[in-house]
Amino acid sequence: MGIAILSAPVLRAGDSVPGGGRTAAEIVTEAPVSLVGKSDSPAFREERMPGCPVSLVGKSDSPAVGENDSPAFREERIPGCPVSHVGENDLPAVGEIDSPAVGEGDTLTLRDVIVSSTFSKVSRSPLRLATIDSETLRERAAARTYPELLKGIPSLYATSESGSYGDAKLNIRGFGQENISVLLNGIPISGLVTGSMYWNNWMGLADATYAVQVQKGVGASLLSDGSVGGSVNILTDSPSETFTAEAGFYGSDYGTMKGYVKVASGALPKGWSMNMMLSHVRGSGYVDATSVNSYAYMLSVSKRFGEEHSIIFTALGSPEKHEQRSSRLSFAEVSEYGLSYNKNWGYRDGKVFNLSLNNYFKPYFTLQHIWSGEKVSMKNSVYVAFASGGGRWSETKGKPLSSYTADGLIDWTSAIASNRNPDGSAANILSQYTAGHTHAGVISTLEYVLGRGFKVGAGLHGQIYNTWEEETIDDLLGADFWIEDYEGKSLAGLAGRDPVKHVGDKVRTENGKNTSHGTAYLSLSYESERLSFDLGASLFGSRTRRWDLYNYVGDDVWSDAAAGTGASIKGGALFKAGKGHSVYASAGWYSRLPYSSVWFSSGNNEITRDVTNERNMLGEIGWRHSWASGNFELTGYSAYWKNKSLMSSKYKQIDSEDSRYMVTGLDALHLGVELSFFQRLGRWLEAEAFASVGDWKWKNDVNAIIYDDYSGVAVGKVDVYCDGLPVGDAPQTQIGANLKALLPKGFAVRASWQFNDRMYADFDPLTRTDPEDRTPSYRLPSYHLLGADASWTGNFGKFSLTVFVQGNNLLGTSFIERGKDGSSHDSDTFTGFWGFGRNADFGARISF
């Protein structure tokens, strides 16, 4: 969609504008700056006065003077006439993204440039946008993942997935993570293997985040191929003009604690500046036996070269270790053991010992060059990530470890006592299933101003994504050795390999994929006072080879290359009808390549030959209206998803009842409407509400290939009857409201309510092989969630102190976040993950 320009600097009443000598008060009504923010949920912190002509709305290319370094937008007011953020040419926004303004005679700051090249602007965007700023992120960041920070946006469903810290899942408009693009500072970071996003790789980095923008539907980026439900763009802290420092502590009533410190150097001599953040999370989780120990860091160093060129180096990462709850629960188990129940652990030698333990570290480095000329702007990026980690796993040749239970927990004593067979071999082992990847790429984008409101853009993105995974024995559980069944589990058979394995030896898995992917795009955009539009097209291609040292030996370890090409066209337009009204529409068509895991769905080197590109057709229309004290937005959308390939997870514990399968040729239609509303109720009270209603259904019957769990040999093919069934895994009806009071003396209180309904369980294709069974998946009970928080901020010279407390699920509602349908499509055979009961967070931060 091209590069959108965003700025929100501050104008002081007495400041003069470069080049004209006029004051800010004189020019603000003529060419005022614009704001970008969360159009789904706007909120402001200034006072408003009816009849005042001053408005901070309009063209985005206005000169900027003054300064604004506060985390949320707080403008200087012209005496006797408080400013307003509403009017004919813009829409008020929440979580305003403020850019430090510059002094007289200077140009925009580097932060302005970074934000401008990364985010879309709500005043001219034909997309449904939601932007959350750093202040709002800090209010919500206690012990939460990135997706959970986005709660409260219509048609967006974010949960902690299983209840383990850092394990999160995100749906937008009914589409799962593999159909949501995630970008970090404008660079796509979603995996090329499955499209999945492992949010625990980025734990702790919320404290180094400047803003997060959600773009629903087609999204603005032409360098990201996966945006069907939408895209999430994370912007980390970037250079500012003044020195700031901050430290904070968060805690929860169930034992998770986090501390962090961050420093921004401000402008240093010769154009240098630096940002740094360190954080540490540790403690117990809400779910039993789910402790966490995680660190995070971020370092950003920038250098300006004259007025037009800048270079930014960023290094970030989050080495972490956390215990997990990997097994879904039944209604009976939750009724007996409670919401925090986890059946993956027990006591071993008197200590808590969890069957599922995850650890991962993904250091990530970027080097970006930004050129901001009068007519030409260019951004070049080089990035590389080295990821490695895994978790505790298990293998069995008899009774699974989770079957040794006592009072709902794993009886490790009995399991170990029974584990040694008469010949000394092990019936069960604990292993380390490790995986990693190297992800590197180069991006170059160019934009040229043609004049008369027109711009053209072009971009290239080349990347490699090389993965590996292996499993090694970690614990024989009292036995002497393990017999690896090469003859039954490996396509190569024994092949001269020793089947007797000890601690440290590899078993079951040793493979990887090497993928290269390229994207090129062209774009055209136009902007006038009332009309703006964007049009773009992209081409992309991918090539993947797989290697496997377990199923193959000698010269056969490499597969043939699986390759393909795809394309996309997307565009949109917005018309400002006057008196605060805007209407917009956008549409997109994708011919999207299969992910590399789909090409090799068998789990061996055989290429799945009948896989073709997905076809996605997206469209939406919307209406925005703003007035002196509020606004609302109404959007309708449609997404026709054709020829989808659906795969089960290959990461499956041996006692799991899930099948290993791949479905091809699946179609779905997602329709929906979204409404958001904001109203300021006087000087100190503001209210907002939202609602979304979807109609998401599968549209055809298909077939599924069933694979052997280890060798990947196809063992069967079954018909799957799902035409007309609701799409599951996210609520199709959401309603919510917030009420916030900004009280004297620095106090603030907020109450929030959300209602989720019409959520259906996900289903296994093997439970849908009866043509007479058209019963929808189990419909999860609807539920209400009520939360509240309070904070106090005091200023002490150059220091400010904020103390807060948050109450979550105040009514103690028992609700289900995710789940899998069973054979009877009711609560008797349903299994899933329940959400947290009543809990609280608290914390404090001090800023300089």
Which sequence ranges carry the predicted segments?
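Short acidic/polar hinge/loop motifs at secondary-structure boundaries
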Residues: 169, 188-216, 235, 340
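C-terminal beta-signal and adjacent terminal beta-strands/loops
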Residues: 97, 637, 687, 755-766, ...
